[in-house]
Design a protein with these regions (language model features):
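N-terminal secretory signal peptides that target proteins for export/translocation
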Residues: 1-5
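Bacterial N-terminal signal peptides
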Residues: 10-21
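SH3-family beta-barrel domains
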Residues: 26-52, 63-67, 74-89, 93-118, ...
């Protein structure tokens, strides 16, 4: 092989090694790891294993079975998220088992009014029973707009779980 061919082959080998050694593009997981904690997300599946630690080697303590249920991320470690449910249950899940879709769950107690407008003096369009999961659309002050079963309206922030007290939701 002549010197030109050796130089070209050598240069290609160096480029290949550099390409392998360089970090790849940022992934969704990398971006997720940079989001603030605590934050709310929802379950991505109707079967989510809740583990005692951040890894498959840790035992499953609970199995969550309600897709779209809101959970709060309270810690993160690599590709694992420590979550808390509305009843205070905590455990670790793989990051792909939660989604950015925002939902809320209606707090326990009596049924709660759903208002037509972001004003408690506006007409009540529905009443939400405890445990109902609704999609979170936006929050303004003490009221949040939610949607469930094709009914949309505003609920008191204190009547739902799945949004931080001072959080702005577009």
């Amino acid at each position: 092989m002549n010197n030109n061919k050796r130089a070209i082959v050598g240069a290609l080998c160096v480029l290949a090694l550099l390409a392998l050694a360089s970090p790849g593009p940022a992934t969704a997981a990398d971006e997720d790891a940079n989001l603030k904690v605590p934050r709310f997300v929802s379950l991505h599946s109707d079967k989510v294993n809740l583990r005692t630690g951040p890894g498959r080697q840790y035992p499953i303590e609970w199995v969550l079975t309600k897709k779209d249920m809101p959970v709060e991320i309270v810690a993160q470690f690599e590709h694992w998220r420590r979550i808390q449910t509305s009843d205070g249950t905590k455990g670790w899940v793989q990051e792909h088992m939660v989604a950015g879709k925002r939902t809320v769950i209606v707090n326990s107690g009596d049924v709660h009014p759903v208002y037509q407008l972001p004003d408690p003096a506006s007409p009540v369009v529905a009443r939400a029973a405890p445990g109902v999961v609704a999609r979170l659309l936006e929050c303004r002050g003490t009221l949040c707009r939610v949607e469930a079963d094709n009914i949309s309206g505003w609920m008191q922030r204190t009547d739902i779980w799945g949004v931080l007290p001072d959080e702005t939701v577009p």
